[in-house]
Amino acid sequence: MLKALFICVASCLLVVNDGNIIHRCSLAKILYEEDLDGFEGYSLPDWLCLAFVESNFNISKVNENVDGSFDYGIFQINSRYWCNDYQSHSENFCHVDCQELLSPNLISTIHCAKKIVSGPGGMKNWVEWKLHCLGRPLSYWMTGCHLG
């Protein structure tokens, strides 16, 4: 009985977790307002492609890695280096709780992503961005988006 209740609650949480998808153009506008267009040489389409390949625009996505660390939020920021999840050792270079990276208010996420991109490797720190976005035409990510 307890096991069935746990499965039911876990399933409900997964459904809620999947419901925090931001529209591509809404994200573009927020990123533009936070001065990410051209930040460290990366365009808005780079950021949109990153958000898509990492989380499919899911602000509340959490993913466990084989090393026991977790990736959080729309950019899947890793707990081993960038945020504190209070579960495993973290360098916490962004000085932020990992749970803040799941907030619909993307300011903490954006500040942390800026810190990551400003360091060695830039967006190449995200393997999925390297595999699916780097060196590809990305302008279509802005199709239909009006920033003004």
From Swiss-Prot:
Residues 20-148 form the C-type lysozyme domain. The keyword Disulfide bond applies. Residues 1-19 form the signal peptide. Disulfide bonds join 25-145, 49-133, 83-98, 94-112. It comes from the Eukaryota. Its EC number is 3.2.1.17. PROSITE patterns: GLYCOSYL_HYDROL_F22_1, GLYCOSYL_HYDROL_F22_2. One of its GO terms (cellular component) is cell surface. It is found in: Secreted; Cell surface; Cell projection, Cilium, Flagellum. SMART domains: LYZ1 (SM00263). The active site is at residues 54, 71. Pfam families: Lys. One of its GO terms (molecular function) is lysozyme activity. Its main location: secreted. One of its GO terms (biological process) is defense response to bacterium. SUPFAM superfamilies: Lysozyme-like. Keywords: Antimicrobial, Bacteriolytic enzyme, Cell projection, Cilium, Disulfide bond, Fertilization, Flagellum, Glycoprotein, Glycosidase, Hydrolase, Secreted, Signal. The keyword ATP-binding does not apply. Belongs to the glycosyl hydrolase 22 family. May be involved sperm-egg plasma membrane adhesion and fusion during fertilization. Exhibits bacteriolytic activity in vitro against Micrococcus luteus and Staphylococcus aureus. Shows weak bacteriolytic activity against Gram-positive bacteria at physiological pH. Bacteriolytic activity is pH-dependent, with a maximum at around pH 5.6. Monomer. This is Lysozyme-like protein 6. It comes from Mus musculus. The gene is Lyzl6.
